[in-house]
Amino acid sequence: MAEAKTNGQTELVFLMDVSEPMADFASDIIAGFNGMIARLREERTDILVTTWQFADFCLYVDERVPITADSVHMEQDFFERLRIMREQVARQAAPAPITLEDGKPGRRVLINAIGGVVCRARYVYKHYPETPARTMFVIITGGADNASLYYWTPDRLRDLVERQEKEAGWEFILLGANIDAAQVV
């Protein structure tokens, strides 16, 4: 297999828990994220930022955006706007069968989110001619997974993360609120 070309850049991949309980930490999360981005902007401009958010679903916000772009920040009212959006969607949603898990605040698909985002990054790097010289995943969560139902299990995810650390040199950082990191994954 040919050695991948690097572009000398660093890619920061943020995976942020936006489940309802995280709203209790909103000001700390927003200030911490924006502060870190501001410090990194002063130090270097060769950083790409990818931001994903998850609760009971996972979606990307920005993908491979230069750190100098104005879109790389969190608005102060982010969690409040998210709460309002959830309420609007809940009112408009068609009735569905109710299960014991429905309606419980704080549902997190942490394992599915991490596994999916790591696989997405692998796919992107495979199809881009140049990959970042350094890739760092920053996972911000307030609790352990309690909603992943699909492909990923803790053991499969651990194997994937360890393989990427060993083979590709990727780094993974878990920033948690009120959790024991060993119990998360």
Segments predicted by a language model, with ranges:
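Acidic, low-complexity intrinsically disordered regions
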Residues: M1-V184
